[in-house]
């Protein structure tokens, strides 16, 4: 999923998927033709990129991609992995893997899912000239450096990774550069989904009308296409799917909303079946409104305040001091209580508290405490290097309930540091993310990361490793990279978690982004549906929702 997959209030990597989510579009059925009454109506948002698994790192697109494709592994609602397309995955050293596929899997165009479907897709995702946003997920594979533009002239020396070899139609081998503790776990992430041959003929066209092998497929109707941009996406069960996530409904309609208040009103009136993000205006009253029709709990979603290191005053030592000052100037606890009514928890590290291995008492995490005196002292030290002038502007997408908390953060910064700090709304998530991804945004911005698989490394490597696809601020620290590599090379998960936590000491010192809070998800539903559950990373368990 994303990548940073990341939602504003909720909704990752997959690969985050960045969890920068938004809800864009219009009202239920608006422009969507005749609504089939058996579709489960769920909220979503216009994907900012074509629906290609190796380049979908946002939560809007990620939730669709995960319905349309199936990988070697899949995750249940608790985040537990199990084999899906894979019949077996064998390794004796966490370096060399032999992967066998189950027979009789096929894409919705009728073509078979073969070893080449995986190997060709992974090579496409890794090749630098394809500029795929999830490229860094393939970095452990031997030969990645040669295809990713890692040669001296910055151009790929090869077009295929040497560590991938097709044995036959249903078997292939993978050789990694070094032991990678979470490689097996990441094989259910969207970056590793297979692609049919038709995709490579015209990837842009494929992204507009993807052909997958997952539990659902895009479903045109006599009155309109499955995907009406900025309106909705319809998916129906794939009759040829025989994996772990068999749908228990007759299809889903992802409705794109211009704001969460409208979505919440539709939920109450029965025009929406499931809403995965309660708007701030309804947080004090949703329990009264929904009765027993909601669920809540901590999920793997992290929110942060990001400032590109290339901006004036935010590079070098001056920038480090200013970011540390901003962290100390934000009253996280007050905002979590007053704006989010207890549905957020103040950050204690750079991952998420629901993940295995999370430690709320990391050395140095006092930099995440609200400390106005320290904030002013650090800002003054930065001014001694180069005097501050102008505004501190925080960009955000206005279609996902962000204004309240961005204004609160800006006011906290203004009151503590005595500078002019303001929020800057942008109308849609898609346009907002395009500026960030293209590195043309000229201000700070809100960000979020939704887990793609339950691993602390997955919250660290895509966002902070040098050159990673979701490293939107341009952070680079070779010492952090080395510490992260040590965590990935650990012989067991317990040691890996300890080393991942140790690697965060560099992040506490450098403060590449300002962690804000973790999600406590609240998902609400109408009386038309049942069996609604929230998954480990904050999304509804779509396949198991029952309507009628």
Task: Tell where the protein language model's regions lie, with residue ranges.
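Extracytoplasmic/peripheral linker and loop segments enriched in polar/acidic and small residues
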Residues: 165, 324, 336-337, 419-433, ...
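Structural transition elements
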Residues: 345-382, 399-404
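Surface-exposed binding/hinge segments that line
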Residues: 90, 130-197
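Long beta-strand-rich cores associated with HINT superfamily self-processing modules
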Residues: 523-548
